[in-house]
Swiss-Prot record:
Protein source organism: Acinetobacter baylyi (strain ATCC 33305 / BD413 / ADP1)
Protein residues bound to Fe cation: Y164, Y200, H224, H226
GO molecular function: catechol 1,2-dioxygenase activity; ferric iron binding
Reaction(s) the record says it catalyses: catechol + O2 = cis,cis-muconate + 2 H(+)
UniProt name for this protein: Catechol 1,2-dioxygenase
Protein family membership: Belongs to the intradiol ring-cleavage dioxygenase family.
NCBIfam families reported in the protein's UniProt record: catechol_proteo
GO biological process: beta-ketoadipate pathway; catechol-containing compound catabolic process
Assembly notes: Homodimer.
Binding site for catechol: Y164, H224, I225, H226
Biological pathway: Aromatic compound metabolism; beta-ketoadipate pathway; 5-oxo-4,5-dihydro-2-furylacetate from catechol: step 1/3
Taxonomic lineage from the root: Bacteria, Pseudomonadati, Pseudomonadota, Gammaproteobacteria, Moraxellales
Domain notes: Contains a helical zipper domain, consisting of five N-terminal helices from each subunit, which forms the molecular dimer axis.
EC number: 1.13.11.1
Chain's gene name: catA
Essential cofactor(s): Fe(3+)
Length: 311
């Protein structure tokens, strides 16, 4: 039986009451957002004839999502993070701003307070038995294309099991393992020694993967390395690079892959290269330069204020 009541005055009045629009006090912006979201959800219930059983299954799902702390995982999986990037790209295009280094999603696993050094850092603690040495380096350029000294380059990535320090369920990693902040040298360069990361998948029994299963989708990410780059007079850049050749590089469940952000890991076995890089054996090398953009009327209009773990 088809029931159509959404457009009745009773329902529209009720939406205003439920959203607090008829009450003094509260936050007007929150009221505006809740009214729109409630309206869209009520309309979806009517248009799709969502049953009470389906509705309460959804409520139970949200409870489980919160209990597992996976909202930050589901968000990129449903494309919300990428959509926000698309909106910022469109805003930049309207302002005539060209992003030589594309932005992409931050992800949920940044931790503030990583050890800081100038020019160079060793990121891994050397304890991963499967770790393959990686030398990652590049130059930070300013908005005019000149090397930028004193820029802050924050880098973080997973280990060979796909786990991040501070979020590793095995408890095997030390604090800030594979998390560092590097201040670029007088030539605008940064350099780190670390290990090649592995990609990861959503917890197979968790609510994110359960929903992806219903959508016929996998929950895998390719091997990747995260960046924040900031400098005086420039907008903070949030991006990440994917390791070329990973089977999920162009099939990332989080939709973070973008042209210009796929980097080859070049293998080196030459004894002279091994000696020059002060490593113990064969290693991989990745080179990634980044270019920043100027502030907009003195303001960083792309900085995102969101809850992040701080240690």
């Amino acid at each position: 039986m088809e029931v159509k009541i959404f457009n009745t005055q009773d329902v529209q009045d009720f939406l205003r009451v439920a959203s607090g629009l008829e009450q003094e006090g509260g936050n007007p912006r929150v009221k505006q957002i809740i009214h729109r979201v409630l309206s869209d959800l009520y309309k979806a219930i009517e248009d799709l004839n969502i049953t009470s059983d389906e509705y309460w299954a959804g409520v139970a799902y949200l409870n489980q999502l919160g209990a597992n702390q996976e909202a930050g995982l589901l968000s990129p999986g449903l494309g919300f993070d990428h959509y926000l990037d698309m909106r910022m790209d469109a805003e930049d295009a309207a302002l005539g701003i060209e992003n030589a280094t594309p932005r992409t999603i931050e992800g949920p696993l940044y931790v503030a307070g990583a050890p800081e050094s100038v020019g160079y850092a060793r990121m891994d603690d050397g304890s991963d038995p499967n770790g393959h040495t990686l030398i990652l380096h590049g130059t930070i350029f300013d908005a005019d294309g000149k090397p930028l000294p004193n820029a802050k380059v924050e880098i973080w990535h997973a280990n060979t099991k796909g786990f991040y320090s501070h979020f590793d369920p095995t408890g095997e990693q030390q604090a800030f393992n594979m998390r560092r902040s590097i201040i670029t040298d007088e030539n605008g360069q940064y350099r780190v020694r670390t290990i090649l990361p592995a990609g990861y998948g959503c917890p197979p029994e968790g609510p994110t993967q359960q929903l992806l299963n219903q959508l016929g989708r996998h929950g895998n990410r390719p091997a990747h390395i995260h960046y924040f780059v900031s400098a005086d007079g420039h907008r903070k850049l949030t991006t990440q690079i994917n390791v070329a050749g990973d089977p999920y590089t162009y099939d990332d469940f989080a939709y973070a892959t973008r042209e210009g952000l796929v980097v080859d890991a070049v293998e080196h076995t030459d004894p002279e290269a091994i000696k020059a890089n002060d490593v113990e054996g064969p290693f991989a090398e990745m080179v990634f330069d980044l270019k920043l953009t100027r502030l907009v009327d003195g303001v960083d209009n792309q900085v995102v204020d969101r809850p992040r773990l701080a240690v």
